[in-house]
Amino acid sequence: TCPDIIIDYIFVDEAQKLTIKNDTRSLVTYSAIEQTLNLNPNAKLFFSSPNLSNPEVFNDLFNRDHAKVYRSIEGATAQNLYFIDLLNNKFSYVDKNKLIDIDNVNQTYTSVNDLIFQINKGKSKIIYTGGIDNTLSRTRDFLRYIKKLQSNKKPQNFDLASQVREFVHTGYELAEAIEYGVAFHFGNLPQAIRDLIEYNFKIGNIDYLFCTSTLLEGVNLPARSVFILTSKKGTRYFEPVDFWNLAGRAGRLAIELAGDIFCVKDESGTWNDKAVKNLILSNKNEIELTPSFYLNDSKRIKELEQIIKTGSTEGIQNSEFLRTLSDMVRIDTLRTDKANNLPLINYFRNNGNNDILHYALKSIDNINIPTHILLANSHIAINSQHNAFNCIRNYSIDELKLSWNPTNEEIKEKLALIFNIYQIDKYSKGLNRLNFNSIPYYAVILTKWMHGNTLSEIISDAIVYYISNRKNIYLSDKTQEPFDQNNSIHITKLVNDTIKDIELKIGYQLQNYISHYCQLLSLVFENNPGANWSQFIEFGSNDPIVWQLQFMGFSRHCAIFLKKNFPKHLKYDQENNQLYILNRAEIKSKVKQNKLYWLEIQALL
């Protein structure tokens, strides 16, 4: 936060994310809005959300009295909704929340690939498949299907495919799929590749887009047809608001009058009767939501109380959500000057949960970290922050501070220190938790990432590591095989795992700990706390020119590309921390149209 900045307007798009149950991201979003409002009490607050019958819930959440609410039930295009049960050869369409059978079509389509290929042939199609593993297997299966039909490759996509091979790896399966007008899309893809896929889907170079729920995360990508092959989002069933948000991608304004939504059951467990009733036959205009921290289950309230009292999450499902919520309650009880006006405190007080507030206040008696640091780091357990704060005082600044040009050995040493003082193995929870034994691996990735290595270089090094150490690759069905660099499935799995580690474990989890560590160093040792590695991670470089280019709006990959290919055009004034770009027209002219960097450079130079 910066006290010199006054915010007059706050716009919250996709506001339904504040209501996602057992999702810590909803709590982080709430906290960011609430803190911004506390610093800017006169700011005007705007929410937008699809398919919601009680939009006033967002104003109530933040105690906004006399707020105006507008609700529309009109869609941009008409939509036709179908349910196709291939296991029982039943085809139906939805009319007034009822399934109406369609006769004489069950012999036309024998597989889901028949449906995807033949229905609305020649029109754009989004195929929702659930998780990443399903997305990849469905893409592979469809690619085999169209090859058997002797479908031709699309020459206009050859350049796109070569860019994917250059940016990621020659064996990455996405490249071959794109040559046939097919692509997959999920959160672990590099943003540059996602942008490339979305752009080429919009202009018609990509016809079939297999995806996860990433398309629910604010990506505006409509299509003529949307195929929904499962009622689940990850391991959980869709909430109606998510289902209709995804279905709303069907129909392209100003291109056609209607869009089609096909919910297809071709495997057991993808669509059961309950999902059909709660989703397909639900009224999208009558969806009511409640904020994620409104706990209506007495068991969950008791579990929250247990975590606050004991600090233990043992035996609790979705414990990371309740742990984060418990810390938010504890922090808010510290904010004594604001406590009477804080929505979180008011909610528990008004619902008769004063015991929770009592235990929360009692649990922070010995916490002496400044409130502003606790508020900025709710994703790190308070007890973990407290332990680190106390441990740091036992070291000298020379033992703690981080260097500006770290070696792999220094990174390993400092990561081990951070793991120990934060007790990360104790407080890090979940399937994707950090692990002390993986520090050598984290250090290798961190070293390359912070020194500006490209993704393809990092991937190539990972492949060499797997080969030289005769490592196994873990596949989607929980089996493992000796890694084979000539197996495109192995390459794709390794690429996706590496990108996930860069973005999640390095770029989010470790960055959060390192950022907090640097905040504590600045607090305890006021002079020269050393380099801030969290900035190196955020920018993916320790080069100030690459930083400055990203400040201008360029992505990491594009900033590194410009630094590498046009160094004479980039003049950095170190004294004033200012970057000057010379001969912009020449740079634009030398970057080939439709290249990975072309759109960015044309827009920003």
Regions found by a protein language model. Give the residues of each.
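Conserved C-terminal RecA-like helicase domain
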Residues: 1-2, 112-208, 223, 232-244
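Structural recognition of the conserved hydrophobic beta-strand(s) that form the central parallel beta-sheet
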Residues: 11-12, 43-50, 208-211
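Conserved interdomain linker/interface between the two RecA-like ATPase lobes of SF2 helicase motors
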Residues: 42-143, 183
